[in-house]
């Protein structure tokens, strides 16, 4: 290879992309950071509540190993354990790094970092900067990247869209095709590697907490070019958002972490002002059903319980699909200091002061545990080799993924405040591996014929010319709304195969209608319509991945809840019984009377279910449809067992 600096293209200016850009430049590489909008408006800024690390500042006995266990348990054991363990052990150093960069984390009266509790753990391990943690982290990393821009090692291309990878004759990624959203120009960027840190796919649903640019188009394009997509069916539904007709605005888990209580009137016909309803007539259903974790059960659990209260028990506030999230027992000073950001959001969009009256909330589409399939390289002990070129590489050589665009860290359900951690961790961790990958290439990008880049650019120019020529009767924005409503109605909190089959056929109807779309604006300059039509095409394919994965996975795991396959854990069951059961099985038959009969029956069914379904769902694009296969999950460190939070 030529003796020059290695250069990579990073698609996405959120935490994963910025962390990687900083670290790659520190290794004397060159980066181009591509962003659909201003870097400081990347979707990572929307994360409110905090970032996890087991620093144990409050002397509760927390450790990185406990953080690791809580994370894999929260994800229903569907994540590769060596990766998760390494992330949790690196977390304290990441917090201290961000602190040194100037992130304005909240502090105790003594000046130490302050921590709050989040869902799925009994420890205070979430560092936070009021209720704007994501924004503060992005701004700190953005400053570091801008320093490298000043030094000439990095450049940023804001208001540019990633269209696809440039693949050579061997299928190796050699660069990116990008679209200038202002001029309409399409051109290529040669690179030794391309990294997709492009965020999640929440716009597949009609309403969500996510930014309107969270279409998943970049990851879906990779899938259409041959990359594997993993665990698409696992969509996180956040339990607390402001109901709305346009989008759903997040009320951070930090509200419950700071003492917020979820309740409804015990009497479904009680129309009184919530402040006038006495404690005895309030149903704190999470606290009653889960006395250990109370309002801080994991998000999948809380969302299912709220859904049950509203739709099965018919106890929604004033007969509507919402429950109360109550912080009125906290002082205004306390709320403004620790939750000021979300207090202001709720006041602005509802006209009600949450310091004085309980908030009305309901679950909302929030995050995707699934994403592009990515690899990792183990060391001699079966843990993570930070220098492995395989780390975070997709099934397309030279194309990597990080952050919400990849699937590796959260299993079937993400714990709150682990998303910011996984983004920064992957960005920092993968830089060394990418540098080693570029060193290992037998052929440099400089040796690739210019025809490869010209042909790829021409393909996309023709694609956009064809889009602009579309002159049918379908409005693409209305078609997107119809697609999103199909997903909301059929592929949400509670799933059944009949509804999923209905969604599957309806999505194909949308795909047929797409051929009759009309491009409403054919100009080049500052015209978002052709881009949106291309993104809609990607969202149709992504909705097929999500729906088919959900349809084929006949079990209940994490956020994927099919009541027909709920194994109904006995109420007095202790998960440690399952470990004893497995040990007994190793030595032959389980002695008669060792376990209660209903417990034994449950454990047998649980083991059989895990043997079949404790696997990663892998989708590959074949004949215009997702072909689904399954891969084993690395569970070498902790034996998977039933989850229990009460």
Locate each region found by the language model.
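Glycine- and aromatic-enriched mobile tails/lids
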Residues: 2-7, 20-23, 29, 38-40, ...
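Glycine-rich Rossmann-fold phosphate-binding loop(s) that bind the pyrophosphate
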Residues: 12-15
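Short beta-strand "acidic-cap" motif of Rossmann-like dinucleotide-binding folds
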Residues: 29-35, 231
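Conserved N-terminal glycine-rich FAD pyrophosphate-binding loop of Rossmann-like flavoproteins
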Residues: 37-70, 236, 247-250
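Conserved redox-cofactor binding core of oxidoreductases
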Residues: 99-185, 190, 197, 241-249
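FAD-site-proximal beta/loop scaffold in flavoenzymes
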Residues: 164-188, 352, 356-409
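Glycine-rich loop(s) and the adjacent beta-strand/alpha-helix scaffold that form part
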Residues: 193-249, 317, 410-433
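An anion/pyrophosphate-binding glycine-rich loop and adjacent beta-alpha core
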Residues: 221, 227-357, 433-436
